């Protein structure tokens, strides 16, 4: 996000945030968006392309871009980076065999200049499944401690199925973004 975008948001006080939600396929991105919005999560289909959900959260309007995570779609993720205020990376904490892929894709995202100023929330999802790695274990696998010190980030354990941890994560994300782009509040 450039300086002009920040100034524009301060001046207009538009109270909108653009959130990009990505992660490998079947990590729970769509379920999380629906759960936060209080919608039915009993029947979820894989996201082929993207969905945009606009929700009011606290006193802000969140435009959440839920982008499919299939291998064939990942090369298109870069089309959604512009003007992203917050990046949500969703990890299936129970899918141990794909954690290397997960780390590689996150590393690639974090190299993107257009995402450099975005707050990063890592949701260690599926904590309700026996054998799932804890958020600390996921953090070690993803090597989060080596991340650029200027990046604002947080990892939160959650369950899209039960809803546990989702509010904690989104509360942090919204407050972190607000403290950066709505400085005059």
From Swiss-Prot:
Expressed in seedlings, leaves, roots and inflorescences. Its main location: cytoplasm. It is found in: Cytoplasm. The keyword Cytoplasm applies. GTP binds at residues 23-30, 66-70, 125-128. One of its GO terms (molecular function) is GTP binding. One of its GO terms (cellular component) is cytoplasm. Disruption phenotype: Embryo lethality. Embryo development limited to the formation of a few giant cells lacking microtubules but not actin filaments. Failure to localize KNOLLE in mitotic cells. Giant nuclei and nucleoli found in both the embryo and endosperm tissue. A lipid is attached at residue 2 (N-myristoyl glycine). The keyword Protein biosynthesis does not apply. Belongs to the PILZ group of genes that disrupt, when mutated, the microtubule cytoskeleton and produce mushroom-shaped ('pilz' in German) embryos. Supercomplex made of cofactors A to E. Cofactors A and D function by capturing and stabilizing tubulin in a quasi-native conformation. Cofactor E binds to the cofactor D-tubulin complex; interaction with cofactor C then causes the release of tubulin polypeptides that are committed to the native state. Belongs to the small GTPase superfamily. Arf family. This is ADP-ribosylation factor-like protein 2. It comes from Arabidopsis thaliana (Mouse-ear cress). The gene is ARL2.
